[in-house]
Amino acid sequence: MDRFLLSERSNYLGNTGAERIDKLLKLLPIVTLVVTLVTFVAFVVAYKNRQERPAYVVETHESQVEGRLVMVEGVQVVEFLGIPFAESTAGPNRFRRPVARSLPRKLSARRLGPPCFQKRDGVNATNASSPVETSEEMTTSADDGTLPASNDTRQPLSSVAAVVSETSVGDLRSTSRISSPAPWEDREQSSEDCLHLNIWVPHMESGNASTSSDSGEAKDHGPKRPVIVFFHGGGFQTGSNSDPRYDGRYLSALGGVVVVVPNYRIGSLAFISSSSDVDEDEPGNLALLDQWMALEWVRSYIGDFDGDPGCIVVAGAGSGASSLALHLLSPEAQGTVMGLRRFVLHSSSAFGPFADQSVPRQSQQILIPLARSVGCTGSGAPELLRCLRTVSADTLASLELGPGRSFEPTFESQYLPDTPSGLLLKIPPFRKQARGASVFASKHGHASFERLYVVPVVLVEVLMGNVANEGFQAFSSFNETVPSEISVDAVLHEFLPEELAKYGVRDAKALLRVYLNDTTGLSWDGMQSAVSHLLGDLLYVCPTRLLARYLSWGTDSQVHTFRMSQRMSYSDTETMTRYEDVDLVFGRPLRQPGSTEAEKILSREVIRAWSNFAKFGSLPAVNDSSSGSTIEWPSYTDNEEATVDISAVGFNLVPDEHRHHCFQLQALAAADIV
């Protein structure tokens, strides 16, 4: 009996074990899938953690600022994004001077801040032939709320596909239309709390900063680094430091410099004002005052970011370059900007369409109609401005001044009390001296100069220049106003004179003869080339040359000029157009797929040259074909006007092909334009 029970028990256990094994075998695929999924998730998490950039904290006298590490060709760069340098310009601060802002005790600077409100009508101020790649690194989404923003739903730039391009001085007219806005034109991303800056620091290891993995020991790598502060362009109408074009990591890493790119107010929110000669509270020209405050912030704080406050180079493109030239001339900025020694100006200067005071003054002529257009009533400027402070920023950013007009600097404020020519006469080296000589032989000083033996006050080193095809966008914009199926002759003699009149040209026919000796049988391509050349000279090249002459002959400043002519592979034009020179400075060919090896080499050479100018004030030697030798980059003088052409074939000394045209333009255009 016992034996039988034992046998039965064995059979029972055997049957049960077999069933269990069978069940386990059936569950095996599910178990395998679960294990695989868990392993995959663990791998992804581990990979993400490995890729996650460590936080990098800088301690200032009032704050701990957290940035992040990025790698650029094996070089560590610390990136600080969206650091506020002024209070929000909303509410009572609208139309007023920027107010200094203290940093919070802890600040996360790992995400871009919002762009300033700006005009958005499908017009974007860049070169449509030169699309800018979006950056997966530079994103605008808010990061833990430490940087106040008007909207927490902003999308990263990488989520917005847009072909963008930029113009410069006075040029909502010189724009190309696109189907979608640039990310910084998106009203949902914009804010009046937009006065912030981005900083890139190469291989930062000084004692006031540490990574999250540090042992806590202070490290010091020696002297502070030179600083390049770069102001973006956009014709004073568009643009932002969130444009990937101004991503400073490559310039910082390869140049060994600290790079700072600030925001500033633009459009109506920057240039609507009261009669500012009696009311300092709403002074106008707020874009310039924002830039001034950004420079003050840099001088105060940049030492904490390994930057040398005694070696700051200020650079700009387009309206950013125009701003720098105006700062140089402003009597109010002398204490701040004149303390800086080196400047780099791309494609613009203080002279240009906006410098002509023949247009009505904003504060006296346009404040009332603008206010009426948005429902504000009242007779006095203070009352109208109080009302305008209650209007949405979106509405104000959309305001129009009329055909051929845009919001831009005016010359009636405490900061800019006179035209550029008038301001030059107020700078000591340009005043009449004991000998009775004047640096200007004519009313505006455009015709000739006398060398003065004076003790110079303005002692700066300036690198300034243009691209080979400055007028491409201006012609493209003009071409959009011309009806199709129209003859070349009609364009030249009916439509173009009206366009030139917007820029102060008094004798369009005479000016056309300078660029077109014979229009008989002229092809459309021939006309486009000539008119593009004309507009480029009028708006950009000649104003830049004029400032170079003023600075080099009116002071003992060292001025060097350049022309960049390399055709970029991503461009539809035959030679370099506006802002493609900025691409070389910021290393775009090094990060954009499809760039040619020649473009990459050229970008490295430009970064090296610009960085050495920032560090030492020195420039590379150039090739002189006339002597067959290499010589020092010559300074710019009125009798020599040497220009260095920069392209893939090197840095070459070339004759200034614009000189003759610029002198003729002086006689045919409004006095303060060229």
Segments the model singles out, each with a brief description of its role:
Residues 2-8, 12-288, 309, 593-606, ...:
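Non-catalytic accessory segments of hydrolases
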Residues 32, 144, 281, 350-355, ...:
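Substrate-gating cap/lid region and adjacent catalytic-acid/histidine neighborhood
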Residues 85, 388, 582-584, 644:
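Bulky hydrophobic/aromatic "packing anchor" residues in well-ordered structure
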Residues 368-402:
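Accessory cap/linker subdomain of secreted extracellular hydrolases
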Residues 626-644:
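Active-site-proximal substrate-binding core of FAD-dependent oxidoreductases
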Residues 614:
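Catalytic active-site module of serine/aspartate enzymes centered on a nucleophile-bearing elbow/loop
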Residues 26-43, 142, 182-381, 416-418, ...:
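Serine-hydrolase-like catalytic core of hydrolytic proteins
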